[in-house]
Amino acid sequence: MNSLTIVTGLLDGDPNLALSAESILPAVKAGKATWLIKNSSSSITGNLLDYLNISGVKIIAESDSSLYGALNQALKHIDDGYFMIIGAGDTLSTGAVDFIHATLDSNPNLDGFYFAIQMAKSGNILLPRPSELGHRMACPHPGAVLSISKVKTLGGFDERYQIAADYDLLCRYVAAFGASGWSDQVVVNYLGGGISDFRMIEGFLEEELIRTRVCKSKQIEVCVRGLHFLGNTAIQLRRLGHG
């Protein structure tokens, strides 16, 4: 069985961490996964800290200036095998870790695997299509299970991107090692509500820059799509009475 590390990065704790723990700890207790929690402070205390005080859970409290900085620091503590990133409040679906292990074990030559995720609030399922990453965020990052050694050769997350560093890493990973494999099986229920939901325009522009730099999109296409996005956003705001 391949080594699997679940990584959660926090800037200053998160009340939703307990929700994630309920779905992750059974796999940890069964020896099927390790949970690495990278927090920029010592804010995980009390009953939650006691709850997490088991073998297989590692909490690292170090100062970080950004979420992707925290995740890069976390990756340094993983020696081998595969990892996936679960945000605070995200939960593993029933049997997810067993399915991930079975998939990896039956595909030993793949450098990574991409699974579907389900939006917790809407119930919508996002299916992975790594070959389409050059055009859109076609592999939701919570469903990506990647080789830690391969990610380290790429230098981890590019912290110059504040919103879309996850998309950048996936694009570079597929460009370097191929599309690998994917499954429409849901492994993560995604809570949402992260920074990309509140800074959509910045995220869009970062993604376009990534497509230009990594995926070799044409600059004129970037400009046109950016203008279309801004125009459509203005129309929606007017309809909502904000302009």
Language model: regions and residue ranges:
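Cell-envelope/extracellular polymer assembly enzymes that use nucleotide-activated donors
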Residues: 2-5, 168
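Short, well-formed alpha-helical segments that are part of the catalytic scaffolds
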Residues: 12-27
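Short beta-strand/loop segment that forms part of the nucleotide-sugar
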Residues: 21, 31-41, 58-63
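A conserved acidic beta->alpha catalytic loop
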Residues: 37-48, 87
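Glycine-rich, basic loop-to-helix element that forms the pyrophosphate-binding segment
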Residues: 61-78
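Short aromatic/hydrophobic "clamp" motif used to bind/position activated sugar donors
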Residues: 83
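Conserved donor NDP-sugar-binding/catalytic core segment of glycosyltransferases
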Residues: 91-125
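Conserved nucleotide-sugar donor-binding catalytic segment
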Residues: 127-210
